[in-house]
């Protein structure tokens, strides 16, 4: 009888043992979607992704989003459904498998695009991950990154010149690298691009609008420097509908 009671006790203990006695593999897939555009992937250097335990700060996984920007017609359609899957097999993502013992609050931080650090942005979010649940299928965990890429191509930094009038050339694009142009989902008239001229001491001189060159994402304008000295030129881009913006800076010295 004692033996039977002990056996019954063992059975009950087994039945009452917590389900998560051992850590459970929990697949996670993270994609970063540029505001009003496509996924940020290999063509822009990817996004740095870090997953941390929110309570302890301990890193759990890190890496970069790799892959393509995705299917334009699928992502940019105005009629997509509530649960539409935007990712294709090639769409950029970072994948990891976390071993979770219990429901865990994590902080997911993304930074980039890594190939355009002058325009990079950082976004972080917290969420509860449950052991054994699949966070990798469909759209996975999708994070939206605001901003615009601005890259001043001319004048190069620290240019010394005798010419009072110089040409400004800038590349302006979405954070995924998607081009601005008349034959793209990102028409030129949607954006305001201008150059702001400052003296080296910080005094604002004036702003000059940049005009679309006819080549995808390239904007240009001449600007006149009135007196000798060092100047800063900050080229900015703004989307008044989404409120996305970006900037890049260069310097010029008029002899």
Question: Where would I find each of the regions flagged by the language model?
Answer:
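Short amphipathic, basic-aromatic surface patches that mediate peripheral association
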Residues: 31-40, 171-186
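Short acidic/polar inter-strand loop motif in beta-rich domains
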Residues: 101-103, 110-121, 238-247
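Surface-exposed, short loops/turns at beta-strand junctions within beta-sandwich domains
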Residues: 100-102, 224-229
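Aromatic sugar-binding surface patches on proteins
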Residues: 70-94, 213-220
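Short coil-to-beta strand junction motifs in C2/discoidin
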Residues: 41-48, 183-193
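Short, compositionally biased P/S/T/A/G/V-rich stretches that sit at domain boundaries
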Residues: 129-178
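Structured interaction patches on ligand/partner-binding surfaces of diverse proteins
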Residues: 114-139, 254-255
């Amino acid at each position: 009888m004692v033996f039977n009671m002990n056996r019954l006790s063992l059975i009950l203990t087994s039945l009452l043992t917590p389900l998560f006695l051992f850590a459970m593999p929990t697949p996670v897939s993270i994609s970063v979607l540029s505001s009003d555009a496509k996924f940020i992937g290999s063509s822009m250097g990817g996004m740095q992704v870090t997953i941390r335990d929110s309570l302890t700060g301990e890193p759990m996984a890190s890496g970069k989003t790799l892959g393509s920007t995705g299917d334009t017609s699928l992502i940019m359609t105005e009629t997509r459904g509530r649960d539409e899957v935007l990712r294709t097999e090639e769409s950029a993502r970072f994948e990891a498998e976390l071993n979770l013992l219990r429901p865990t609050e994590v902080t997911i931080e993304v930074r980039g695009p890594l190939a355009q650090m002058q325009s990079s942005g950082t976004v972080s979010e917290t969420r509860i991950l449950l052991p054994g649940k699949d966070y990798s299928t469909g759209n996975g965990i999708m994070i939206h990154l605001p901003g615009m890429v601005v890259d001043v191509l001319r004048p190069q930094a620290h240019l010394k010149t005798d010419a009072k009038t110089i040409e400004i050339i800038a590349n302006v694009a979405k954070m995924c690298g998607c081009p601005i142009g008349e034959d793209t989902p990102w028409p030129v008239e949607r954006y305001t691009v201008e150059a702001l001229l400052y003296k080296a001491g910080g005094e604002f001189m004036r702003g000059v609008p940049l005009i679309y060159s006819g080549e995808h994402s390239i904007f240009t304008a001449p600007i006149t420097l009135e007196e000798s000295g060092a100047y800063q030129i900050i080229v900015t881009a703004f989307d008044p509908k989404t409120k996305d913006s970006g900037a890049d800076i260069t310097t010029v010295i008029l002899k």
